[in-house]
Amino acid sequence: MTVSRLQPYAVTIFAEMSALAARIGAVNLGQGFPDEDGPAGMLKVAQDAIAEGVNQYPPGPGIPALRQAIAAQRARHYDVDYDPDSEVLVTVGATEAIAAAVIGLVEPGSEVLVLEPFYDSYSPVIAMAGCVRKVVPLVPDGRGFALDIDALRAAVGPQTRAMIINSPHNPTGMVLSDAELSAIADLAVAADLLVITDEVYEALVYTDSDYRRHLPLARFPGMAERTVTISSAAKMFNVTGWKIGWACGAPELIAGVRAAKQFLTYVGGAPFQPAVAYALDHEDAWVRTLRDSLESKRDRLSAALTDLGFEVHDSQGTYFLCADPRPLGYHDSTQFCAELPHKAGVAAIPMSAFCADTDNTWNHLVRFAFCKRDDTLDEAIRRLEVLR
């Protein structure tokens, strides 16, 4: 029997929709995984590592080459310095890093702020840690979304100890502006809050956005000592199944994350760690090409959905577009997404899956993933024509 605090999270809609798509042959634009491989050089390093016997437990913090490559990437791209020995920890994906950060650094009973809508692992992780989730909704901003910094300030109470900040943001595609990040930093310092940043889409900020470049919160004054920066290879190098992530932060923060992580999975992905180290050191050009390709795919899907009558919100980063099907006569996105695979042969995710159970504010929006081959996207667009 599942314990009460996890009963609301027993089954994820992503697993349900992916299974349904596979069962009936629907094009899966629901779950955010690509259907093309990462850079060939990286794959070759992994293959060689397996052949050469790199198949046993790696060091607990991750192999030195990967920790060094992570630190070098953060310095090269963001001018943020980390000691690879004491300030970098390799994890089994970013999801484990988030879980270990909350479990290892936030006392039970504490409030953790999250921006709504939010990635689906945040709530169960907060529940597993015995903490209390407190949501701060994003607000409409023209064709996109923005942070209501006054609402964030108002949400901080005497029991608030941490916040999870995700930018580029899944599921909306929003990228927090410099001004929004600065306001978050000022609040965190003033209220003495721990900040866990989920930056897995850091490489996928599109060139036509107002911001153009991902900016880590750890760069802001007073934030280095209170920020756990989390990212992964999954979205950067098209290897979601490798589950190689990392956490970076001050030594005392990483010690807490490691204390929890070592009893969750201990280690993982031995032959993939040298491959990701290689990619971080050598595949910046490949990542830029990936970003440009995804920007084109975003534009193709956005134009098609708009032509069909959806109201499509701007996506400044990530794999995702948010669309409003109300102009087509659908006012409940949960019902729309339940019917769509059967009616059109396409799977998508209702925005309600990323929200508090009692909040219907977002239930008019649908998330579509565009991280697919061009022929897959074209087939999805062709099938969606039935909605006209």
Residues covered by each model-derived region:
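Helix C-cap/helix->beta junction micro-motif
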Residues: 24, 129, 190-191, 308, ...
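Conserved PLP-anchoring active-site segment centered on the Schiff-base-forming lysine
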Residues: 102-126
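Conserved core segment of the aminotransferase class I/II
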Residues: 224-295, 302, 308, 388
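Active-site phosphate-binding strand-loop segment of PLP-dependent enzymes
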Residues: 138-211
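PLP-dependent enzyme catalytic core of the Aspartate aminotransferase-like
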Residues: 153-154, 339-348, 354-388
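Conserved glycine-rich beta-strand-loop-beta hairpin in the small C-terminal domain of fold type I
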Residues: 277, 294-302, 312-325
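A short helix->loop->beta-strand "cap" motif at the edges of active sites that frequently abuts
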Residues: 110, 131, 190-193, 223-225
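N-terminal small-domain helix-loop-helix segment of the aminotransferase-like
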Residues: 2-93, 100, 151, 279-282
